[in-house]
Amino acid sequence: MKQYLDLMRHVLDHGDRKSDRTGTGTLSIFGWQMRFNLDDGFPLLTTKKLHTRSIIHELLWFLRGDTNIRYLNENGVSIWDDWADENGDLGPVYGKQWRRWETANGATIDQIAQLIDGLKHNPDSRRHLVSAWNPGEVAGMALPPCHALFQFYVAGDRLSCQLYQRSADIFLGVPFNIASYALLTLMVAQVCGLRAGDFVWTGGDCHLYLNHLDQARLQLSRQPRALPRMIVNPGVTDIFGFRFEDFRLEGYDPHPHIKAEVAV
């Protein structure tokens, strides 16, 4: 994960000091890109331990179209708790937009089903996009989408994905997002009869919170280790049919976890 560490080092050395919504303050740059060849291994950070259970369950929760934290909490995942209301609701966040985007005439669009159909029947299309950024519903969201838009691309039998992340919390958020969309690429490739190619991460406002700088320096002092492999149950052929038990991580040998506070 040299690409990720290079971004962290660049922001520490060259980031502009900025204020932010949370009042914490950041070091920030605008515009950065990283590319991960998924043949090289699953891009899960090794310079600190990540909670893989949270990454998998959050992605399955998105794909369910769910916007209440009940499913996450039932599966030991608390990453959305700080933004939920007293009933566990988050408003029309990712799952709603992915699965039930509302049109002007009152109909809904299942962007994920549409994506899979397009990849299977018109792989060379340049319209394999899913957007979570719905200007008409942003005001009702507990947290507007940070990872706002993603696009798939087919070349031969290889499927690649590019994510645009408008707001990138480098220390806490970005490692989760890289792993989540790499996993989504493996899943989509499998159900479409393709091989996983590259995952491309593109960031807009890429920032380190000022209360994460010591943790970032500690992470940069650690030597990256070999990437693990994510094994996906080959029997699943429906993108909505995956369960947590269909994924197995092999060879993950990270450095210890580094604690850092979430800016809410």
Curated annotation (Swiss-Prot):
Q: Which Gene3D superfamilies does the annotation name?
A: Thymidylate synthase/dCMP hydroxymethylase domain
The record's annotation in InterPro entries points to: Thymidate_synth/dCMP_Mease, Thymidate_synth/dCMP_Mease_dom, Thymidate_synth/dCMP_Mease_sf, Thymidylate_synthase, Thymidylate_synthase_AS
Q: What residues does dUMP bind to?
A: R21, R126, R127, R166, S167, A168, D169, N177, H207, L208, Y209
Keyword list (alphabetical) reads: Cytoplasm, Methyltransferase, Nucleotide biosynthesis, Transferase
Signal sequence annotation: none
Which residues are responsible for catalysis? C146 (nucleophile)
| GO BP annotations listed | dTMP biosynthetic process; dTTP biosynthetic process; methylation
Entry-linked CDD domains: TS_Pyrimidine_HMase
Q: What is the protein's known function?
A: Catalyzes the reductive methylation of 2'-deoxyuridine-5'-monophosphate (dUMP) to 2'-deoxythymidine-5'-monophosphate (dTMP) while utilizing 5,10-methylenetetrahydrofolate (mTHF) as the methyl donor and reductant in the reaction, yielding dihydrofolate (DHF) as a by-product. This enzymatic reaction provides an intracellular de novo source of dTMP, an essential precursor for DNA biosynthesis.
Its name, as the record gives it, is Thymidylate synthase
Organism from which the protein derives: Aromatoleum aromaticum (strain DSM 19018 / LMG 30748 / EbN1)
**Classification lineage:** Bacteria, Pseudomonadati, Pseudomonadota, Betaproteobacteria, Rhodocyclales
- Gene coding for it: thyA
